[in-house]
Amino acid sequence: MPFTFKLFHVDDSRCGMPVSTDGVLLGAWAPLVQAKTILDIGAGSGLLSLMAAQRSLAKITAIEVDTDAALDCQQNFNASPWFDRLEVICCDIQAYAQAHTQVHSQAHNHAEQSKQFEHIICNPPYFANGPQSSNVSRATARHTDSLSFDSLLAAIKQLLSPEGCASLILPTESVSLFETKLSTYQLELSQKLLAASVEGKEANRQILVLRHTSALAHDPKTETEPAVVAKLEDAAQQQLYIREKNGQYSQAFSLLSRDFYLKL
């Protein structure tokens, strides 16, 4: 159903996955660190791209494989205040990475190197087993058949700039498998946020921030904006819960999302 935020509107009526708290949490918390270029993998309705556009001055490319979702995404971009910094491309991320590698190689006539982004953001599909929805768009958005962890990490390795970072949100039960694959793609975890739905519950979601292995040896925070520094310090505690036991949003989540939600 359509969802109105403070500065933009999201129509997700044709998307396999509707606007969710997961997406809002990732979009609000991801350490953009003044990124000038951002890639949104599996953009859906464009929520993450729109949140990133509100938080930054970056040029943002959204990749969405589902035609109907890409139409919603384009419509939402066109209606936003940042339409001139947002683009959506309807294709899968593997095809996008391959095409940009070839174009760059032909233009520069040297070893392959992709167009790269300073930040990559993704709310990926994570169900590896179990029955799939009869709704093709929903199945694509939720199951790793459409984008495996290996394919996603290969794309991040190829498309992430040397000093850039990638932010992803996963269910806690999927994190161990995901993390075992990082070294294969010369990626390492630089930050992690554990998020619980309710105070006192175990974390059911985790935001992982990845960087190239070589980037971790020289990772000064000198250019990090003050607002982001505070978030990174909070992330070091590796905890955040969305709601208090009384059902109200927690102070931490309210602070993160108050620039977006109408009623905060």
From Swiss-Prot:
GO molecular function: nucleic acid binding; rRNA (adenine-N6,N6-)-dimethyltransferase activity; tRNA (adenine-N6)-methyltransferase activity
Record-linked PROSITE patterns: N6_MTASE
GO biological process: tRNA processing
Domain of life: Bacteria
Principal place of residence: cytoplasm
Bridged cysteine pairs (disulfide): none
Cellular location(s): Cytoplasm
Reactions performed catalytically: adenosine(37) in tRNA1(Val) + S-adenosyl-L-methionine = N(6)-methyladenosine(37) in tRNA1(Val) + S-adenosyl-L-homocysteine + H(+)
EC class: transferase
Gene3D superfamilies hit by this protein: Vaccinia Virus protein VP39
UniProt-listed Enzyme Commission number(s): 2.1.1.223
UniProt keywords, alphabetically: Cytoplasm, Methyltransferase, S-adenosyl-L-methionine, Transferase, tRNA processing
Entry's Gene Ontology cellular component terms: cytoplasm
Pfam families linked: Cons_hypoth95
Family: Belongs to the methyltransferase superfamily. tRNA (adenine-N(6)-)-methyltransferase family.
Function: Specifically methylates the adenine in position 37 of tRNA(1)(Val) (anticodon cmo5UAC).
Name recorded for this polypeptide: tRNA1(Val) (adenine(37)-N6)-methyltransferase
Higher taxonomy: Bacteria, Pseudomonadati, Pseudomonadota, Gammaproteobacteria, Alteromonadales
